[in-house]
């Protein structure tokens, strides 16, 4: 399929890429990709179902975990249409409007996930540092308020992205470097001044960096507090809970950092590596986090096993 590349016609369609150099194998590559999407959606859906149907899990930590699962579902479903259209149907083109909408949801759910991980770190710090006041501070109403505030904050932060991208002119190139639309990828194709997008994109990245720093501070304080717990059993329980949260933080932020490095040195990195890193960013975290929480959180693991046994009977 020929790709339009002209300086005379304003472009309204973008072309996404699958695996550069492996186009002949896209149908086979779609099998593991579809499997990963399916596992991620089923895994996060299971987490939500277990927490909703089990009254003993109706507590602040599990409500925040539900928010994390919902943001992972949103992230998976946002990228699903273009990824499947490329690998299953060999249809890499997408309209500019669809592209701008997709990057809004991808970035929005990414920022929301970062916010939820920050909330969860504060939740664990409060539970360990001040356990007697924990339930009185984090009431169900307050948890709902926190969730609503951070959801609005996340979406408002990325709301300008589609509008600033739409205000740009695209008249030279129209091929993106990923299987889905990202703000930093689209703005590079503009043939008009994109300084506003560069500055605002940097501001968005800075917000994620602040979240990461605050999360690191929270868990550092937790690790300092844990040795002071009188009961060895409670100390191990607190550490075990924190380990699952720390794993979730690493799973989320590590691909983002790697992709940022790849974008920074894009001229020295093969297009295949670029695409692989981008797919890891959106496929692996939603896939791995339900597994981590099922393995490391006994309350969820026991309920999942019980439900599976119940359905088998």
Curated annotation (Swiss-Prot):
Keywords for this protein: Cell membrane, Disulfide bond, G-protein coupled receptor, Glycoprotein, Membrane, Olfaction, Receptor, Sensory transduction, Transducer, Transmembrane, Transmembrane helix
PANTHER family: OLFACTORY RECEPTOR 51A2-RELATED (PTHR26450:SF168), OLFACTORY RECEPTOR 56B1-RELATED (PTHR26450)
Assigned GO CC terms: plasma membrane
Membrane-spanning segments: 28-48, 57-77, 102-122, 142-162, 199-218, 239-259, 275-295
UniProt topology in membrane: Multi-pass membrane protein
InterPro entries: GPCR_Rhodpsn (IPR000276), GPCR_Rhodpsn_7TM (IPR017452), Olfact_rcpt (IPR000725), OR51/52/56-like (IPR050402)
UniProt source species: Homo sapiens (Human)
Protein name (Swiss-Prot/TrEMBL): Olfactory receptor 51A2
């Amino acid at each position: 399929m020929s790709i339009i590349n002209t300086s005379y016609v304003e472009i309204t369609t973008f072309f996404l890429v699958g695996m550069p150099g492996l186009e002949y194998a896209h149908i086979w590559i779609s099998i593991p990709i579809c499997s990963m999407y399916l596992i991620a959606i089923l895994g996060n859906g299971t987490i939500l179902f277990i927490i909703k149907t089990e009254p003993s899990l109706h507590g602040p930590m599990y409500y925040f975990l539900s928010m994390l699962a919902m943001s992972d579902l949103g992230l998976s479903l946002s990228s699903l249409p273009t990824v499947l259209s490329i690998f299953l149907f060999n249809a890499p083109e997408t309209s500019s409007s669809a592209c701008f909408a997709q990057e809004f949801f991808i970035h929005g759910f990414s920022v929301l996930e970062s916010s939820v991980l920050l909330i969860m770190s504060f939740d664990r710090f409060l539970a360990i540092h001040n356990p007697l006041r924990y339930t009185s501070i984090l009431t169900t109403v307050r948890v709902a308020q926190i969730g609503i505030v951070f959801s609005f904050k996340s979406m408002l932060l990325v709301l300008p992205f589609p509008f600033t991208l739409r205000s740009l002119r695209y008249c030279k190139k129209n091929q993106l470097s990923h299987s889905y639309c990202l703000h930093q990828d689209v703005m590079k194709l503009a043939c008009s001044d994109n300084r506003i997008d560069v500055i605002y994109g940097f501001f968005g990245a800075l917000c994620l960096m602040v979240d990461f720093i605050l999360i690191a501070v929270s868990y550092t304080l937790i690790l300092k507090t844990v040795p002071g717990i009188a009961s060895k059993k409670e100390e191990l329980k607190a550490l075990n809970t924190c380990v699952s949260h720390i794993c979730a933080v690493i799973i989320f932020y590590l691909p983002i950092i790697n992709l940022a490095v790849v974008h920074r040195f894009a001229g020295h990195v093969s297009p295949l590596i670029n695409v692989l890193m981008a797919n890891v960013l959106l496929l692996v975290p939603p896939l791995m986090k339900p597994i981590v929480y099922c393995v490391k959180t006994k309350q969820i693991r026991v309920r999942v096993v019980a439900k599976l046994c119940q359905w088998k009977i």
